[in-house]
Amino acid sequence: KFGVEANIGAPQVAYRETIRKAVKAEYKHAKQSGGKGQYGHVVIEMEPMEPGGEGYEFIDEIKGGVIPREFIRLSIKVSAILAYRYRCRLSVVDVRIRLVFGSYHDVDSSQLAFELAASQAFKEGMRQASPALLEPIMAVEVETPEEYMGDVMGDLNRRRGVVLGMDDDGIGGKKVRAEVPLAEMFGYSTDLRSATQGRATYSMEFKKYSEAPAHIAAAVTEARKG
């Protein structure tokens, strides 16, 4: 009607990444090719934070002026950018980064040199820290007539769901509470209607992020590299 083209595709799941172990990473960017060179050097420590999918923390532990303040601020900025663009363009969360050491050159150090040093140290740290894919988990509640309980439970299990409990709904039916990965919930409304002759209803809301199984992580990583 309005002559506007739309890109239509499957809904996207907001996967994230985190790390499983604490590591120390260092990168020294030093180049000399006649005239002014390039020099930037940072040492960082990375460690997992409490799970929650909320973000990351950067702590400046530089002492004695081994890196000038302007380059420390730049390292923080670069790490913040990379925390949202690492590997498969996924946000990195629940990671604490400490800038613990480094060095600079009075003449050769520059913003570019420290950008490169900080970015490579971050990437090397992520490689060493056993990165893991996190997927959003939904709290799902299904209200269904009792005769369809088996079909509802079986379908939730096929969707990698974990059933947390069942209650009477007060009108002769059952209320099922479960946690299910968001990626498995696409098309659920249609499937539920079909399995229960339209007599069951459901609701869902975000609950948490949880580490995805290895085969899911591999598939997501491969798809996002394309």
From Swiss-Prot:
InterPro entries for the chain: EFG_III/V (IPR035647), EFG_IV (IPR047872), EFG_V (IPR035649), EFG_V-like (IPR000640), Ribosomal_Su5_D2-typ_SF (IPR020568), Ribsml_uS5_D2-typ_fold_subgr (IPR014721), Transl_elong_EFG/EF2_IV (IPR005517)
An annotated Gene Ontology molecular function: ribonucleoside triphosphate phosphatase activity
Signal peptide: none
Keywords per UniProt: Cytoplasm, Elongation factor, GTP-binding, Nucleotide-binding, Protein biosynthesis
One Pfam family here: EFG_C
Main location, first listed in the record: cytoplasm
Domain of life: Bacteria
SUPFAM superfamilies assigned: EF-G C-terminal domain-like (SSF54980), Ribosomal protein S5 domain 2-like (SSF54211)
One GO term (biological process): ribosome disassembly
Localization of this protein: Cytoplasm
Role noted for this protein: Catalyzes the GTP-dependent ribosomal translocation step during translation elongation. During this step, the ribosome changes from the pre-translocational (PRE) to the post-translocational (POST) state as the newly formed A-site-bound peptidyl-tRNA and P-site-bound deacylated tRNA move to the P and E sites, respectively. Catalyzes the coordinated movement of the two tRNA molecules, the mRNA and conformational changes in the ribosome.
Family: Belongs to the GTP-binding elongation factor family. EF-G/EF-2 subfamily.
Official protein name in the record: Elongation factor G
Source species of the chain: Neisseria gonorrhoeae
Gene: fusA
